[in-house]
């Protein structure tokens, strides 16, 4: 049976970085489901499709070809959008459109297909609760709101040194997104009962990786 490690948590908690390194150390595939939702969100927003379940249909979603290239970069309809999905705009669209049943259904099916094709470290917001409830190992990665905003700010500044966004603005957007993710009726962000809680606020990446590997 294909093995799966599930890592959930809010954006900026460090789960993406940690999941990727853990996957590399194990020689497993790294599946970033948040990137997939951001890709679909951008696809729909670019086409000015309302965030409404009557507007976002299966036929429209079939036009969004979401995949990963050999280097693990997210690809939408043949275009590498790895940089674009890091923007606050992409995060907002992902949170909005992910509330729609048609989007969740398509993404969940695609994530299961990819994740079960080989041993995988899968990270997102509902992996241990919805996508892979029977995962071999589950971790819920968190960090303080201020630390998460600081990390996102540094990430954006690295990509675009001239960006005008402030940490305060990122924190405000982040809090709004967290509230949406936690309160949505469909697959809300929450810790699975059998998931191990890992707080990365005052830990280095290496410390978190070693902590997780020690628990496998």
Predicted segments, located by residue:
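Glycine-rich phosphate-binding loops of nucleotide-dependent enzymes
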Residues: 138-141, 145-146, 152-156, 194-197, ...
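Small-molecule kinase domains that catalyze NTP-dependent phosphoryl transfer to phosphate-bearing small molecules
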Residues: 60, 111-118, 125, 129-130, ...
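N-terminal phosphate/diphosphate-binding loop that engages ATP/GTP or pyrophosphate donors
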Residues: 25-88
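ATP-binding Walker
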Residues: 12-13
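ATP-dependent NMP and nucleoside kinases share a basic, alpha-helical "lid"
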Residues: 82-159
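Walker A/P-loop
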Residues: 16
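Hydrophobic anchor at the beta1->P-loop junction of P-loop NTPases
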Residues: 5-7
């Amino acid at each position: 049976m294909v093995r799966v490690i599930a890592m959930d948590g809010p954006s900026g908690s460090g789960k993406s970085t940690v999941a990727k390194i853990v996957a590399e150390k194990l020689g497993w595939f790294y599946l970033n489901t948040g990137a997939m939702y951001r890709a679909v969100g951008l696809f729909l927003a670019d086409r000015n499709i309302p965030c409404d379940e009557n507007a976002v249909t299966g036929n429209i979603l079939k036009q969004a070809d979401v995949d990963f290239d050999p280097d693990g970069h997210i690809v939408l309809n043949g275009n590498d959008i790895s940089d674009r999905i890091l923007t606050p705009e992409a995060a907002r669209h992902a949170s909005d459109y992910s509330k729609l049943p048609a989007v969740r259904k398509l993404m969940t099916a695609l994530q299961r297909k990819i994740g079960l094709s080989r041993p995988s470290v899968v990270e997102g917001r509902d992996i241990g609760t919805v996508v892979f409830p029977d995962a071999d190992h589950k971790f819920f990665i968190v960090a303080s709101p201020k630390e998460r905003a600081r990390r996102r700010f540094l990430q954006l500044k690295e990509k675009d040194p001239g960006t005008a966004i402030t940490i305060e603005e990122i924190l405000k957007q982040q809090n709004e997104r967290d509230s949406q993710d936690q309160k949505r009726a469909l697959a809300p962000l929450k810790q699975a009962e059998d998931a191990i809680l890992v707080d990365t606020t005052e830990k280095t990446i290496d410390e978190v990786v070693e902590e997780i590997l020690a628990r496998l």
